[in-house]
């Protein structure tokens, strides 16, 4: 089953949802993810960091910041999103996909949700296929502009480096221990490919 049913039921609230008076959620923007006041820790404190990774990741972060500044935060591309749509947060119940765990739900770019679907798997060969399935379902409720689709790799890198920070700041957790330094090492190729493509 693809994520189509989950998308139809849960994801694109931004186009029809009216924000109630007094409603507040945090924002997942560049600063919250990769800035100095990042919510899940500093990417520089990822496991196994060295001078080469600090330089490579730093150049990637700079490019992400520049691209997202150009991309903007207009209401057609930024609003309330789930912000943690990884596979562990999809539940199949009676043949239907349900989205769970809205703890991290907040205001962000809609295409950021596409990147969160691939959390911890961004480096695997099948990862792009997950995004294609996600887009298939997403397009049943909302058109995706070419500029949005073209920026998905930026959101993938934003998420990946945010997870590098999370692993570093949660090093005692079972998940972080299972990922270890290898997760940071596997990020090197992703950063290099991103810089070649967009740098």
Role assignments for model-derived ranges:
Residues 44-46, 163-199:
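ATP/Mg2+ or Mg2+-diphosphate-binding catalytic cores
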Residues 107-112, 186, 190:
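Gly/Ser/Thr-rich active-site loops/lids in small-molecule metabolic enzymes
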Residues 7, 65-111:
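Active-site acidic catalytic loop and adjacent metal/ATP-binding pocket
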Residues 1-55, 76-78:
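A cross-family kinase active-site recognition segment
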Residues 110-143, 159-175:
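Active-site activation/catalytic loop segments of kinase-like enzymes and analogous catalytic loops
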Residues 54-70:
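Mechanochemical coupling/switch segment within NTP-driven translocation systems
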Residues 26-31, 154-166:
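Hydrophobic alpha-helical segments that form the core
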Residues 144-156:
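All-alpha amphipathic helical-bundle segments outside canonical DNA-binding/catalytic cores
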